[in-house]
Amino acid sequence: MTDPRRRTGRHFLTPENLSSTLQITNLPPEWNQDIITSVVAGSGPVIDIKAKNDPRTGKLTGVLFDYLTSKDCKRAWEILNRIENFPVKIEQIIPPNYKDHLRETANKNSQKQVLQLNRDSYPFEAGLELPFEMVTEVPIPRRPPPPQAANNTNSVSNNTNIQFPDILSKASKHLPSFQDGSIIAPDKISQNLSKIPPLQLIEIISNLKILSNQENIQKSQLESFLDTNSDITISVTQALLEMGFIDYSVVTKVLKSQVGEAPSLLSSNNTSNSNTPVSVIRNNTPLHVPSNEVSNNPNNMPLNVAMPMPMSTPPFIPLPLQQQPFGFAPPGPFMPPAQGPSMGQPVLANQLGQVQQQNISSTEGPSNANKANDSGTINMAKLQLLPENQQDMIKQVLTLTPAQIQSLPSDQQLMVENFRKEYII
């Protein structure tokens, strides 16, 4: 038995002297060995790197960095723990081949070479902050451009070379005519699109694709193209809602942006109509209506009281959202007048106010409140869901004669037409 007093190895074979390897675990799932090496570079002389994988899945679970000496390993452990936002676990361990490592360390003529590490795979998106001595040893390279931007550039260059065949871009000329019953409309989007002839729909979609693929396209040009057909605009919005690209809050925000000055306009109209219903009206665009038609329709008298309300009062818009299968309002809110909600509606109120001035002596009510001047009957069940003042206003709008509607500007005719589509059955 060896005399314990002669066993001197216990004085230098300590865990502190044998721990020459750093084990880095708890790696982010998207990190690999190259990324970890790019971060550890500059922490000290590394002579070997080994990956530690899960034996069942083969997934990387850790990386082992073997340093030249245990002192280098301890210094590297202290430096790496000073890295901010470093989402890993760092441990000092004794390598399995510690005897060979000690033998090579003691041999001054050892051929073990120190690895030259770099930061080619440095994770810029992780937001790490390296200590100064690590950056001095191995500088951080300039951040490369994001790959997404490069992909977008390639896609734009590729899209510029796309050429649609004339059979699609000019479908109405080349494809055969549509046969009734060959296309069905099982859902709301298809029902809206079925209002457009199929050849014209193919042509619209092709032109929209061509327009969107242009490199210098502007948002206003796409908006102008979509404004040419309200059914296309509504169908696109419904499709975006179903696919999850937008939600109801986006639709509500867009509708509210179209009625920006509604509260002030509504309060001013209510105040002026309650105090001086006729004298305070100002009109710079006269409305030319034949006197005989005006006198025959006394229902025009109170139109100036609440005409701006349906397009400017927010409570009027969410009601169709509860009734439509996809939560969309009728075409009116999606096709704002060309003059904007802050100009077109006061003009309409003023012009209808002149009709009131011409018929201020008429006080008789309509002969049939549920019957519109044009063909059709007012949908009273739907109309009763609105406040009482809005019910009266919409009834009066629906009783306008075709001649009076034709005398209005085109944008105001569109407003009246939207009411008729919504409340006449």
Swiss-Prot record:
GO terms for cellular component: cytosol; mRNA cleavage and polyadenylation specificity factor complex; nucleus. Its main location: nucleus. The modification Phosphoserine is found at S272. Pfam families: CSTF2_hinge, CSTF_C. It comes from the Eukaryota. Keywords: mRNA processing, Nucleus, Phosphoprotein. GO terms for biological process: mRNA 3'-end processing; mRNA processing; sno(s)RNA 3'-end processing; termination of RNA polymerase II transcription, exosome-dependent; termination of RNA polymerase II transcription, poly(A)-coupled. Component of the cleavage and polyadenylation factor (CPF) complex, which is composed of PTI1, SYC1, SSU72, GLC7, MPE1, REF2, PFS2, PTA1, YSH1/BRR5, SWD2, CFT2/YDH1, YTH1, CFT1/YHH1, FIP1 and PAP1. Component of the APT complex, which is a subcomplex of CPF, and is composed of PTI1, SYC1, SSU72, GLC7, REF2, PTA1 and SWD2. This is Protein PTI1. The gene is PTI1.
